[in-house]
């Protein structure tokens, strides 16, 4: 046999093998059942076929970026200088999702508060619990006094007066909102979108907007880099030109080397490889999980979330008197670089409001995700 013919046969065999393997993974569009017409005709064809339902194609929600499913090593990516020993490394898998590109801004949160506190006494959404204006102001309206309460002997009056609603701060991250307020915002955002979809064409409901789990947040912050110390990938806090890569406190009494003494407008710094900005610095971010020092080895290794059972009743409702600790991640404008690391864990009580804690939302991506559908 000639050498050329041997190579041709070998290449043909390899192509056939690759084709077989990819088709078995469903990557060639094979696997959907084939058949006759759209009527049952005594066969099990699926209710969607009988009702002639439209197919489902999940859109990327406004302001969000797609995060493909993947596996990574959760935990501390560098030294633990405080010897906390609360974030050991563990390999886990995260499902596909969408996440807000930026932290929720003052302007976006103002749309939420205006909906409930508008000139007409607040609007209502179908199948959404009614909230009195008094309850809304007490639980969900931003606490503007955090700029005075959080810091001793600090001239915070200008921020108390202007940070929340002045147009000069509309693109800055909202602060002074508790975990409960951030969680309620996600529920309202879900109802707000799905009511519009129902009214405009009876479209199927989208999955819920919610706070990301701690594991989801860390996975997204690393941007596909398994052991990245910071969201931008390398272990340095400045780029090659000497510019800071995030809004934080780089040294004792030094808040301004990054260009901002307090918070910065969202999206000022470069995004990570998933397109997310401010995953380090600016404001820390609420996560869905209850905080427990030993939760990482405790939880499952697929889409983990730690739930403190003592904080909930048998129906899964939060017990009001139990002020659970909630995970916060990412570090803020007032924190040193250690708190900006992707693996650093800390917490705050769920009813607390701070001048350095905000949030962003996530949404589950229904169905399989190889990441290729977003290319």
Walk through the language-model features, giving the residues of each:
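Bacterial Sec-dependent N-terminal signal peptides
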Residues: 1-36, 220
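Extended beta-strand/loop cores of jelly-roll/beta-sandwich
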Residues: 6, 25-215, 325, 345-375
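Generic hydrophobic-segment detector
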Residues: 15-16, 60, 65, 86, ...
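Functional-site microenvironments in short loops/helix caps that host divalent-cation chemistry
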Residues: 37-45, 67, 73, 78, ...
């Amino acid at each position: 046999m000639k050498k050329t013919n041997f190579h041709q046969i070998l290449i043909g065999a390899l192509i056939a093998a690759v084709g077989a393997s990819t088709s078995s993974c469903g990557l060639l569009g094979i696997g959907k059942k084939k058949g006759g017409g759209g009527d049952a005709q005594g066969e099990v064809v699926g209710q969607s076929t009988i009702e002639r339902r439209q197919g489902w194609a999940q859109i990327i929600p406004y302001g969000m970026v797609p995060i493909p499913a993947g596996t990574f090593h959760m935990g501390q990516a560098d030294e633990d200088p405080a010897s906390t020993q609360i974030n050991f490394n563990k390999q886990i898998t995260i499902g596909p999702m969408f996440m807000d590109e930026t932290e929720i801004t003052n302007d976006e949160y103002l749309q939420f508060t205006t909906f409930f506190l508008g000139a007409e006494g607040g609007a209502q959404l179908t199948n959404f619990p009614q909230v009195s204006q008094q309850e809304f102001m007490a639980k969900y309206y931003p606490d503007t006094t955090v700029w005075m309460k959080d810091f001793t002997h600090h001239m915070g009056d200008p921020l108390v007066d202007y940070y929340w609603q002045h147009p000069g701060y509309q693109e800055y991250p909202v602060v002074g909102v508790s975990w409960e307020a951030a969680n309620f915002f996600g529920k309202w955002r879900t109802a707000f979108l799905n009511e519009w979809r129902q009214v405009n064409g009876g479209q199927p409901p989208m999955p819920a907007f919610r706070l990301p789990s701690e594991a989801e947040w860390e996975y997204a912050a690393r941007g596909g880099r398994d052991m990245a110390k910071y969201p931008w990938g390398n272990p340095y806090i400045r780029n090659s030109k000497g510019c800071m890569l995030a809004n934080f406190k780089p040294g004792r009494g030094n808040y301004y080397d990054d260009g901002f003494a307090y918070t910065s407008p969202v999206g000022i710094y470069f995004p990570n490889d998933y397109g997310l900005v401010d995953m380090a610095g600016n404001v820390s971010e609420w996560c869905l999980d209850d905080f427990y020092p030993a939760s990482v080895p405790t939880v499952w290794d697929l889409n983990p979330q730690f739930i403190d059972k003592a904080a909930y009743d048998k129906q899964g409702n939060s017990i009001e008197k139990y002020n659970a600790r909630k995970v916060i991640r990412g570090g803020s404008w007032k924190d040193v670089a250690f708190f900006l690391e992707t693996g650093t864990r800390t917490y705050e009580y769920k009813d607390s409001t701070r001048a350095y804690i905000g949030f962003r939302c996530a949404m589950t991506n229904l169905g399989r995700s190889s990441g290729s559908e977003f290319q």
